[in-house]
């Protein structure tokens, strides 16, 4: 199975507001960068979409080390919260409805396809690839051509 590193980030101008995601995929000296902006969304949705879109780039099952500065994404997966929410019909332990269910339903099958290790990195702390993802996400917002985030609540 191929092994690669993925770095992801999401950004939002206002929350909700215009948002974007950026991702960098690194495999044996090769590099792929992806990004997109959206009209009205949230920072957490952009963080999730960065992970989803990066994993969707992979054409076969892979071992992935995924670096994200999103505690929401990393903790939801590594601490198992999302699996509990799904088991309870997308209800959190505090009895409130889980957010971003449409994106979790896209992400979970990708996590079954690939062997993904999530690693949290501190944002804006001189991690070169995380900073590049932030540039991509912010650049996608600034570039215009913003898409509609259909699942934004």
Locations of regions flagged by a protein language model:
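RNase H catalytic domain
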Residues: 8-18, 52-132, 136, 141
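RNase H-like nuclease fold core
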Residues: 1-45, 49, 53-62, 77, ...
């Amino acid at each position: 199975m191929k092994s690669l590193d993925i770095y992801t980030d999401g950004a939002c101008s206002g929350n909700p507001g215009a948002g974007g995601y950026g991702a960098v995929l690194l495999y044996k000296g090769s590099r792929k960068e992806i990004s997109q902006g959206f009209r009205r969304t949230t920072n957490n949705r952009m963080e999730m979409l960065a992970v989803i879109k990066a994993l969707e780039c992979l054409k076969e099952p892979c071992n992935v080390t995924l670096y994200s500065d999103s505690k929401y994404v990393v903790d939801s997966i590594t601490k198992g919260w999302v699996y509990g929410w799904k088991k309870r019909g997308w209800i959190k332990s505090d009895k409130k409805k889980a957010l971003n269910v449409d994106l979790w339903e896209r992400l979970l099958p990708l996590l079954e396809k690939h062997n993904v290790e999530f690693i949290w990195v501190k944002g804006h702390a001189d991690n070169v690839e995380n900073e590049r993802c932030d540039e991509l996400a912010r650049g996608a917002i600034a570039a215009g051509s913003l898409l509609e985030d259909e699942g934004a609540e």
